[in-house]
């Protein structure tokens, strides 16, 4: 097969080092004035696409993000890492809070068809909702084979070999292209964007479109009832002997 075109999905999330705070009304988490960055699993997906391009196996990498205007910063990061151009599916901030895997998967599937890509790469999950559904749903809408939790990816002609870690060992899949692959942490270690590449990324093209331009309805079928902090754990009690342990368990009604 000739050189491929790859679509890589990137999500803007609260930075992994930030301590999450729940809103007083428990409708979500505080995002205003909080540092955001690219989802770490998405970084791995971008890195893998760039490595395939460096091997002359991929000719173009398109970075895609859905959400408010700030998502363009996330796309710029992908461009600085080596993506060729970006597509921002603009969604107002109020609506973006209700975007779920189903809506994003519909967008990605439509873009994959529109751009005539051969490979869709994305992180296996996002660290904010941990849904682990978008890649699978995208493959379902496209009716393409999928390789999830990829720990190694190898292009073999018109097929892609995906190794994935499972309980008790490794599973190897060979998927006929076009295909969808989701990245595990073990797939690679993303590079840091260099200053020259960051400057070049500012000149690369980002196309801004609406979900409606793709014929996608972003209305969510789910609603968040409440978001709460995990309950605080009570302090443990140290015991010196087995007899003390049994006595303590009896005292608290465990035995």
From Swiss-Prot:
UniProt subcellular location: Mitochondrion matrix
InterPro entries: ET-Flavoprotein_bsu_CS, ETF_a/b_N, ETF_b, ETF_beta_N, Rossmann-like_a/b/a_fold
Predominant localisation class: mitochondrion
Annotated positions binding AMP: 9, 39-42, 66, 123-134
Modification N-acetylalanine, positions: 2
GO biological process entries: fatty acid beta-oxidation using acyl-CoA dehydrogenase
Domain of life: Eukaryota
Changes after translation: Methylated. Trimethylation at Lys-200 and Lys-203 may negatively regulate the activity in electron transfer from acyl-CoA dehydrogenases.
Modified-residue entries (N6,N6,N6-trimethyllysine), positions: 200, 203
Residues annotated with Phosphoserine modification: 223, 226
Spans annotated as Recognition loop: 183-205
PROSITE patterns named in the record: ETF_BETA (PS01065)
Similarity-based family: Belongs to the ETF beta-subunit/FixA family.
Known role: Heterodimeric electron transfer flavoprotein that accepts electrons from several mitochondrial dehydrogenases, including acyl-CoA dehydrogenases, glutaryl-CoA and sarcosine dehydrogenase. It transfers the electrons to the main mitochondrial respiratory chain via ETF-ubiquinone oxidoreductase. Required for normal mitochondrial fatty acid oxidation and normal amino acid metabolism. ETFB binds an AMP molecule that probably has a purely structural role.
Subunit field text: Heterodimer composed of ETFA and ETFB. Identified in a complex that contains ETFA, ETFB and ETFRF1. Interacts with ACADM.
Description of its domains: The recognition loop recognizes a hydrophobic patch at the surface of interacting dehydrogenases and acts as a static anchor at the interface.
Protein name: Electron transfer flavoprotein subunit beta
Protein's organism: Bos taurus (Bovine)
Gene: ETFB
């Amino acid at each position: 097969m000739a050189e491929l075109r790859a679509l890589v999905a990137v999500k803007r999330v609260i930075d992994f080092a930030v301590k999450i705070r729940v809103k007083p009304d428990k409708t979500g988490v505080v995002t205003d004035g909080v540092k955001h960055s690219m989802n770490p699993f998405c970084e791995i997906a971008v890195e893998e696409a760039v490595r395939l391009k460096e091997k002359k196996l991929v000719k173009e990498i398109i970075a895609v993000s859905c959400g408010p205007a700030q998502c363009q910063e996330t796309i710029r990061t992908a461009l600085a890492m080596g993506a060729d151009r970006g597509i921002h599916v603009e969604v107002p901030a109020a609506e973006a809070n209700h975007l779920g895997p189903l809506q994003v998967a519909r967008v990605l599937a439509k873009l994959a068809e529109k751009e005539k890509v051969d490979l869709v790469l994305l992180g296996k999950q996002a660290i904010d909702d941990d849904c682990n559904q978008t890649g699978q749903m995208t493959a379902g809408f496209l009716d393409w084979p999928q390789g999830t939790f990829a720990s190694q990816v190898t292009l073999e002609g018109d097929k892609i070999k995906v190794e994935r870690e499972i309980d008790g060992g490794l599973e190897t899949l060979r998927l006929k292209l076009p295909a969808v692959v989701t990245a595990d942490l073990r797939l690679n270690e993303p590079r840091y964007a260099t200053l020259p590449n960051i400057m070049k990324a500012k000149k690369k093209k980002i196309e801004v479109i609406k979900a409606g331009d793709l014929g996608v309805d972003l209305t969510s079928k789910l609603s968040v009832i409440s978001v709460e902090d995990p309950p605080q754990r009570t302090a443990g009690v140290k015991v010196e002997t087995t007899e003390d342990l049994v006595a303590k368990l009896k005292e608290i009604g465990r035995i």
